[in-house]
Design a protein with these regions (language model features):
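Short, intrinsically disordered or compositionally biased N-terminal tails of bacterial proteins
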Residues: 1-6
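Basic, amphipathic "hinge/linker" alpha-helix immediately C-terminal to the N-terminal HTH DNA-binding motif
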Residues: 70, 74-92
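Amphipathic alpha-helical dimerization/coiled-coil segments
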Residues: 86-109
């Protein structure tokens, strides 16, 4: 078994939650998302993010708008929808429960 693969799978499992959480703070440009996820060591390959953003958009959890750029092509800025806020709230409850359960299991002697 390869530890790197397991670590990647663990990150992928919570990536959607983290992306929604970042977007919930306010409108965000894709490169800002990538930067924060990279700094937090949550994303290794940028190509992982774009399909996820498309899935979130299709599920109506996020929306985006195009903004003209003074240097280059227009930029796509993402924001969370009301449906996305409700979804994120449920994920936050699930995350808290998972952390509690994992802590309980991993701190037993």
């Amino acid at each position: 078994m390869n530890i790197a693969n397991t670590q990647i799978q663990m990150r992928k499992g919570i990536l959607e939650y983290c992306v929604l959480h970042i977007i919930s703070r306010g409108e965000v440009y894709t490169s800002d998302l990538i930067e924060e996820l990279t700094q937090s060591q949550m994303i290794v390959v940028e190509g992982t993010l774009y399909p996820l953003l498309n899935r979130l958009k299709t599920a109506e959890l996020v929306d985006y708008r195009w903004v003209e750029s003074e240097s280059g092509p227009p930029r796509k800025y993402y924001s969370i929808t009301e449906k996305g806020k409700t979804f994120l709230s449920t994920l936050s409850e699930t995350w808290a429960s998972l952390v509690s359960s994992a802590t309980q299991i991993t701190t037993k002697n």
